[in-house]
Amino acid sequence: MALSSDYFVRGISRTNNNPALQLDLHYTNPNGFVAGAFASNTRIDPGEPRDVELSAFLGYAWNFDDAWHGRVLASHYAYPWNRAGSHYNYDELDLDISYQGWLHFSAGYSPHSPRFVAAPYRELIGVSEQSAEVSAQRQVFGKLSLLAGVGYSHLDGPKSGAYTYWSGGAAYDLQSVTLALGYVNTSSEAKALFYNAAASGQWTGTVIWRF
């Protein structure tokens, strides 16, 4: 469970720069099967009331050797109570390769990621999105870890485009609770694709409780 001052996905706010309460449940078995569910409040369109994002995922994890690990996930995201109906819903396929658990290389694809287009639609439409990201979380002193990441996302459809996003911060573990502080930013191209939802040098604070 987590409480965050904002909910960012690839540098884009899904809560209109408002706090988010989130719940994540996951299951793994020795054969590599992975499954789980995630829930968060959202407000993708500032003109809409607050909504809830519900997602479920299935996947498989494996080891290349003692240091390198892989995982592939297929996820479905649903926003059941928004006025746009199923226009928000989308699916995503993600591949993650990690080194010793602290360095991650990931790639994702969605055939119908939601994006608002002013003309000629003036509504959310589903467009294909391809993304790639490198991220790291490294323990540096005691229970203190440093975090950093950089990624690239390309969206097709009308007025297609691409942008980069990056973040940095620190996390401190207190047994079952983690406190995190981060900085999120995006390139100027993100504003043309997502308007005010794109991060522009924002700080975020998060409290994570594991049970």
Question: Which stretches of residues belong to each language-model region?
Answer:
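Transmembrane beta-strands of outer-membrane beta-barrel pores
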Residues: 3-9, 29, 39-43, 62, ...
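Outer-membrane beta-barrel translocator domains and adjoining extracellular loop/strand segments
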Residues: 9-16, 46-52, 82-89, 115-123, ...
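Glycine- and aromatic-enriched membrane insertion/assembly motifs of diderm outer-membrane
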Residues: 16-69, 209-211
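Residues that define the transmembrane beta-barrel architecture of outer-membrane proteins
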Residues: 17-21, 50-54, 68, 87-93, ...
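Outer-membrane beta-barrel architecture
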Residues: 24-26, 57-59, 73, 94-96, ...
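Repeated loop/turn-to-beta-strand initiation elements of outer-membrane beta-barrel proteins
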Residues: 31-37, 66-72, 101-107, 138, ...
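Detector for outer-membrane/organellar transmembrane beta-barrel domains
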Residues: 84-155, 183
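Outer-membrane beta-barrel "beta-signal"
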Residues: 138, 168-177, 183, 197-211
